Curated annotation (Swiss-Prot):
Pfam families in alphabetical order: DEAD, Helicase_C
Gene Ontology CC terms, in alphabetical order: cytosol; nucleolus
Residues spanned by motif Q motif: 35-63
Ranges annotated as biased composition (Acidic residues): 344-356
Molecular function GO labels: ATP binding; ATP hydrolysis activity; DNA helicase activity; DNA/RNA helicase activity; RNA binding; RNA helicase activity
Record's protein name: ATP-dependent RNA helicase DBP9
Primary location: nucleus
Signal peptide coordinates: none
Organism: Meyerozyma guilliermondii (strain ATCC 6260 / CBS 566 / DSM 6381 / JCM 1539 / NBRC 10279 / NRRL Y-324) (Yeast)
Annotated region (Disordered), positions in chain: 344-372, 562-586
Membership in a protein family: Belongs to the DEAD box helicase family. DDX56/DBP9 subfamily.
Location of the Helicase C-terminal domain: 274-467
InterPro entries: DEAD/DEAH_box_helicase_dom, DEAD_box_RNA_helicase, Helicase_ATP-bd, Helicase_C-like, P-loop_NTPase, RNA_helicase_DEAD_Q_motif
Length: 586
C-alpha cells in the first residue's frame, strides 16, 4: 500500500531564511511553522549542526519526509521545487540512522547518487557541515577526478557515506569489488531522479542490483522536482510501499516567474545581447544558455569587445574550475555567466518530433571531441540569486526549457526568462551566426508554450524597439567580424590551458592558502584576433534621450585648440649650458 501526501505551501508574504541545504535561502511558504526540529528526536550533535547552519524551522518536505523515514521506516518519493529542502529531507535522516545504529566498526551505510559532478560537490559540502560535530562519521565523493589508487585507499577505510554519480560508482565496483562491500548499506538516496533517466543512467542503476541489498534491508529516497511515469521503473526496482510526497507550488512559482520570447534573426541575437548587457537593461545576475561550446566562446569574444565581462562554464573545463566558477558566481563575483547546455533530453513524452529532431544531434555528439558526460548546468546545480535566464539558444526540448528557467525565481524571489527564437525563414541567412538547432526553434517553442500553459504559466511575446537598437548594428557587425573560427579555436585552447593550470598546479596551494583563491578569476578577456578598443565606449548619440548626458553640464567645447597652448609648445629656445654660465663666487 502506498502513502500519498499532497502538501500545499503557505500563502503568505515572502520572507527568506538561511537554508542549510545549500547555504542559500528558503522562501517562507516552504517552511512548516507548526513543526520543530526537536519533534524529530534527532541526535544532539546533529541537531546542533542544523541550528548552527541557521535553519530554525524544517520545510514542508522535511517535516513530512523525516518522520516517515525515521519512525515508520518508509521509503520516500518526494516531488518539490528546487530550494524547498529536498537535500535535507534525505541527508538528515540518513545521518540520524547511522548515529542511532552506533559506530562500533566502520562500514558503508549509505549511498547517495546524483546525476552530475557539480551536484555531487554541493551535496558533499552540505553533509560535511551536518557532520561538523560527528567526527566519527566519514564520507567520500567518488565524483571527483582522483586516481584509482586514491579511491582504493579511501574506500579501504570504509566510509559511512558514499556520494557519486551512477556511472562512477558502477565503474569502481566492477574494478574493486573485493574492496567495496555494499551489503552493509541501509540507505540509498537518488537525487534528481528524472535527470538520472535523461542522462542515460538507467543501465548503471540496474547494475547496482548485484551489489546493493535491494528490498531486503534498504531504505530508499527518490527526490526530484518533477515526478512522472519514467520514475515508475525506479520505484518498482528500489522501493517497497513508498510514501509519495508532493509539494503543490505551481501557483507560487507562477507569481514569481515572468517568461518572454523574442523572435529574431540569427545575427540579431548577438545585437540584442550587446544592447542588453552594455546598457545594463537587466538588473542583477544573468545566466545565459547556449547549445554548444563554440557558441559560448563566440558570445564571450563578441561581448568582451564592448567591455562586457563574463565567464564561461562548459564540459571541457576541469571539474575544480567548474566548481570554483559556480562558487564565485554565487558570491556575486560575476554578473554574467555563459553556460553551455550540451545535454539532449529525449523522452517519449516529447513526441515523435523531438525524437526525430534529436537523432542528428546525437550522432554529431558521438563524432565530436570527448567531453565530460557527467557535466550538467541546466539542472541540479545551485545557482543563487539569478535575476534572469537568457536562452540565447533555445533548448531542444520543452523539458530542457523547464530545467533552464528553474534556475531563477527561486527561494521566494522574482525572476525573468527571455528566450530568443529564430523563425524558419531566417535560418541559414547568416552562416557565421547560425546555430544548427535553430531550424527546430518554432516547433520547440510551440511545445514549450503548450506544456507551460498546462501548468498555468504564460510565455509572452517580447518586441524590441528596433528604432533604438538599429544605431548599434554597425558596431555589432564590426565586433562580430573579428570573432572568427580561428579566434574561437585559439580562445578555447588558451582558456583550457589556463584552467588546467589553475585546477591542477594550484589546487594544493589554494588548499593551504584559501585567502588567495579570491584572486583567481575566470572572466578575464580572451581577446579575438582583432582588438578594437574603441568599441568599449558607447557614443552619446547612440543612447536613448533619457540616458544621454545633459548638454548643459558638458560645458563649452571650442572648435579650435587654444592658440596660446600652440605657441607654448613651439617655444623652447636654446638650452643654457651649465658649464659656460657657471660663475665662481668671490
Amino acid at each position: 500500500m502506498q502513502y500519498h501526501l499532497q502538501v500545499e505551501p503557505h500563502r503568505c508574504a515572502h520572507r527568506t531564511f538561511p537554508s542549510p541545504m545549500t547555504d542559500a535561502v528558503v522562501a517562507s511558504e516552504y517552511l512548516d511553522e507548526s513543526a520543530k526540529w526537536e519533534n524529530f528526536k534527532l541526535d544532539p550533535r546533529l541537531l546542533q549542526a542544523v541550528y548552527q547552519l541557521g535553519f530554525e524551522k524544517p520545510t514542508l518536505i522535511q517535516s513530512n519526509a523525516i518522520p516517515l523515514s525515521l519512525e515508520d521506516k518508509r521509503d520516500i518519493i518526494a516531488k518539490a521545487s528546487t530550494g524547498s529542502g529536498k537535500t535535507g529531507a534525505y541527508s538528515i535522516p540518513i545521518i540520524q540512522n547511522i548515529l542511532s545504529e552506533g559506530l562500533s566498526e566502520h562500514n558503508i551505510k549509505s549511498v547517495i547518487l546524483v546525476p552530475t559532478k557539480e551536484l555531487a560537490n554541493q551535496v558533499t559540502k552540505f553533509i560535511e557541515k551536518l557532520l561538523v560535530y560527528c567526527n566519527s562519521i566519514t564520507q567520500i565523493n567518488l565524483a571527483t577526478n582522483v586516481s584509482d589508487q586514491v579511491v582504493v585507499s579511501l574506500l579501504s577505510a570504509k566510509p559511512e557515506i558514499i556520494i557519486s554519480t551512477p556511472s562512477r560508482l558502477t565503474t569502481v565496483l566492477e574494478k574493486h569489488a573485493s574492496i567495496v562491500d555494499l551489503t552493509t548499506v541501509t540507505s540509498l538516496a537518488i537525487d534528481e531522479v528524472d535527470l538520472m533517466l535523461s542522462y542515460g543512467y538507467m543501465e548503471d542503476l540496474q547494475k547496482l542490483d548485484d551489489f546493493l541489498p535491494i528490498k531486503r534491508n534498504l531504505q530508499t529516497y527518490l527526490m526530484s522536482a518533477t515526478v512522472n511515469d519514467d520514475v515508475n521503473d525506479l520505484k518498482a526496482r528500489f522501493c517497497t510501499k513508498p510514501a509519495i510526497i508532493k509539494l503543490n507550488d505551481n501557483e507560487e512559482n507562477q507569481n514569481r516567474l515572468v517568461q518572454f520570447y523574442a523572435r529574431t534573426s540569427e545575427f540579431d541575437k548577438f545585437l540584442f545581447a550587446y544592447v542588453i548587457f552594455k546598457l545594463h537593461l537587466i538588473k542583477g545576475k544573468t545566466l545565459a544558455f547556449v547549445n554548444n561550446i563554440d557558441r559560448g566562446y563566440r558570445l564571450k569574444l563578441f561581448l568582451e569587445q564592448f567591455g562586457v565581462r563574463c565567464c564561461i562554464l562548459n564540459s571541457e573545463l576541469p571539474v575544480n574550475s567548474r566548481l570554483h566558477i559556480v562558487d564565485e558566481f554565487n558570491k556575486n563575483v560575476y554578473n554574467l555567466l555563459i553556460a553551455s547546455d550540451e545535454s539532449t533530453e529525449v523522452t517519449e513524452q516529447e513526441g515523435e518530433d523531438d525524437q526525430e529532431d534529436s537523432k542528428p544531434e546525437k550522432s554529431k555528439k558521438k563524432k565530436g571531441k570527448k567531453v565530460d558526460g557527467e557535466y550538467g548546468v541546466s539542472r541540479g546545480v545551485d545557482f543563487r540569486n539569478v535575476a534572469c535566464v537568457l536562452n540565447f539558444d533555445l533548448p531542444t526540448t520543452s523539458r530542457s526549457y523547464v530545467h533552464r528557467v528553474g534556475r531563477t525565481a527561486r527561494a521566494g524571489k522574482a525572476g525573468m526568462a527571455l528566450s530568443f527564437v529564430v523563425p524558419v525563414k531566417e535560418v541559414g541567412k547568416h552562416k557565421t551566426a547560425t546555430n544548427p538547432g535553430a531550424k527546430r526553434d518554432e516547433k520547440v517553442l510551440a511545445r514549450i508554450v503548450k506544456s507551460q500553459s498546462k501548468n498555468g504559466f504564460e510565455i509572452k511575446p517580447y518586441q524590441f524597439d528596433m528604432t533604438q537598437v538599429e544605431g548599434f548594428r554597425y558596431r555589432a557587425e564590426d565586433a562580430f567580424r573579428a570573432v572568427t573560427s580561428a579566434a574561437i579555436r585559439e580562445a578555447r585552447i588558451r582558456e583550457l590551458k589556463n584552467e588546467i593550470m589553475n585546477s591542477e598546479k594550484l589546487k594544493r596551494f589554494f588548499e593551504e592558502n584559501p585567502q588567495d583563491l579570491a584572486s583567481l578569476r575566470h572572466d578575464k578577456e580572451l581577446h579575438p584576433a582583432k582588438v578594437q578598443s574603441q568599441l568599449k565606449r558607447v557614443p552619446d548619440y547612440l543612447l536613448p534621450e533619457s540616458a544621454r548626458q545633459d548638454p548643459k553640464k558638458i560645458g563649452f567645447v571650442p572648435f579650435h585648440k587654444n592658440k596660446v597652448h600652440k605657441n607654448r609648445k613651439r617655444k623652447g629656445g636654446k638650452k643654457v649650458d651649465a658649464l659656460k654660465s657657471f660663475r665662481q663666487k668671490k
